[in-house]
Amino acid sequence: MSVHVKEEPVLVPNCDVENTELAVFNGNGESELENFGTCVDEITDRVNQLEQKVVEVEHFYSTKDGAAQTNTSKSNSGGKKIAISQPNNSKGNSAGKEKSKGKHVSSPDLMRQFATMFRQIAQHKWAWPFLEPVDVKGLGLHDYYKVIEKPMDLGTIKKKMESSEYSNVREIYADVRLVFKNAMRYNEEKEDVYVMAESLLEKFEEKWLLIMPKLVEEEKKQVDEEAEKHANKQLTMEAAQAEMARDLSNELYEIDLQLEKLRESVVQRCRKLSTQEKKGLSAALGRLSPEDLSKALKMVSESNPSFPAGAPEVELDIDVQTDVTLWRLKVFVQEALKAANKSSGGTNAQNNNNTGTGEINKNNAKRRREISDAINKASIKRAKKA
């Protein structure tokens, strides 16, 4: 059945929701249309702002969950471990950098204990070759820098300790070992310097073992403190994000209420559909695609919860629907049919070449006919009443 849908005049609402006068404007309500448009624009701007906040909240929880999964996988792979970073001595002035990276900072007591140990090694009778930088030029050691990548001596270490360039004892330990390892690398085992370096390194390692328990205890304590600090910071962030999420939820709910109020105001200011328009709407519903028809029936069920929108067969009585529902259906049907007319040619050609899709279309067409028949029956009943 071919139905000509009459083009309707412009419907102009007033954003003042208290004004419930019903009216239809044939292009003469520009000011009220502008007023309504301003209301919608303001709500749209607010929704866009809230959308950005929603993205922030979603990003926070997505990254939080990802980090939690990563930590869980790490903990499941083995027992609890405490990572102790090796010192990086590539640059002399490293104290500030080490601290900024959150590495262990030895206590003053531990630093004093290590200084005593260092002084004992430096004052040993065999320590004299290692107290100053190697005189490469004076001794004619032309290949020294080819063999030794990073020269180090006890005198340089002492100066760095006095100027607080070390942040923890592990850094000093690494440099002291480097002094003796360099000597053992460059000199042959039979030479005196090699023997002296090997002996002092052994004594140094023995003394180092004496302070290890306290060092490990300090490092563990610092790791625990950092973990607690991080956990507290995370809890604070989560609380802030949770509060933001609640505020967003409340604001979005308020916007929904405003939109619903505006929609009701629009419909109240619009005239009622005529009998002829209702007949046209009934016929147009039967021409919708199954997907669009389901959407239309869902609109009916939103204002009438008892309406069985998902049932195999439905009987839709246009006369009992609210003005809000009728206008929503009218606008939706017009837009849906326009879109369907634009794409019907290509869609039909594709469906004819696909057997499986053709079978689905047959079933869909059957459902459209059933619903259309039900709507037409309702129209006949209404005509008889008239």
Curated annotation (Swiss-Prot):
Bias-annotated ranges (Low complexity): 345-358
Compositionally biased region (Polar residues): 68-78
Keyword flag Nucleus: yes
Ranges where the NET domain occurs: 263-344
Gene3D superfamilies: 1.20.1270.220, Bromodomain-like
Induction profile: During seed imbibition.
Null allele phenotype: Impaired cotyledon greening during germination. Seeds are deficient in the phytochrome A (phyA)-mediated very-low-fluence response of germination. Mature plants appear normal.
Tissue-specificity statement: Barely detectable in stems, leaves, siliques, and dry seeds, but was present at considerable levels in roots, flowers and imbibited seeds.
Domain Bromo: 105-211
Subcellular location: Nucleus
Pfam families: BET, Bromodomain
Biological process according to GO: positive regulation of DNA-templated transcription; positive regulation of seed germination
A GO CC term attached to the entry: nucleus
Stretches for region Disordered: 66-106, 340-386
Keyword Transcription regulation: yes
Keyword field: Activator, Bromodomain, Nucleus, Transcription, Transcription regulation
Domain notes: The NET domain could serve as an interface to localize different proteins or complexes to chromatin.
Function of the protein: Transcription activator that plays a role in the promotion of seed germination by both negatively and positively regulating the abscisic acid (ABA) and phytochrome A (phyA) transduction pathways, respectively.
Protein name: Transcription factor GTE1
Biological source species: Arabidopsis thaliana
